[in-house]
Amino acid sequence: MKRLVSAFLAGAMALSLAACGGAASTSTVASSAASGSAAASASETAASDLDYIKKKGKMVIGYTVYEPMNYTDADGNFTGFDTELATAVCEKLGVEPEFVEINWDTKVVELDAKSIDCIWNGMTLTDDIMANTATTKAYAKNAQVVVVKDGTDYSSTADLVGKTVVAEAGSAGEAAIEGDENLAQADYVSKSVQTDCLMEVAAGTADAAVLDLTLANAMIGKGTDYASLKIVDELNAEEYGVAFRKGSDAAAAVDAVFDELKADGTMQALADKYDLALAD
């Protein structure tokens, strides 16, 4: 009998409390859910991404082989402008850089899956990249150029209508081809990396390649493996930046380090070493 009375009293108290406070509590939760769930989801990455990288003690950097940004030199050393710059930034942030070669066409997928923490590899700051990732400010200048074999008659992209033109899949070069009235009428073939594009033109299996000026300056012409190739046209001017996951606070942290490295002359020294122009 005592147990029944106790149960009855407990139930009554619960109903009383629910009547007094339940409506307000439910309203508050509903309001918070309606106004804050999206913000919480968006801010989760911003609040945790830099900490996530620091707790690991390393920044996993996605790259493709691309001289002068990330490549292995004649002595077997992994080097390049982006390699050295990323290493300097990581030192300032107190983490180690880990460079992982990626498929450029699926770079954002790998970023979102946390296979990598950032894309740092002469990456053009396109509208699409800036809409789908958290990017740093621009740190270097670039342009898309047309490369052909020496001796090729070329006056404009109109000469390439119906010809075989190559570019790296998912690259700014591919976008330049798609956006040019004449190049859009070429027989376009995508390649895995920009260096494959040079190989195709040198071998005569492609008539032209559209790729980064920075790479072309470093890899073609007298004294290079592609001495028979030349730049004949400059298309879109552009700038490079680093991409982190959308909403990440790591991009702002890297921007702050960029400011330090510009102020102390480190970035200019690297630009001079690799024959690049820093962004304004």
Task: Briefly describe each language-model feature range.
Residues 44-122:
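Extracytoplasmic small-molecule ligand-binding "clamshell" domains
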Residues 18-39:
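Bacterial lipoprotein signal-peptidase II cleavage site
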Residues 28, 148-165:
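Flexible hinge/capping segments at coil-to-helix
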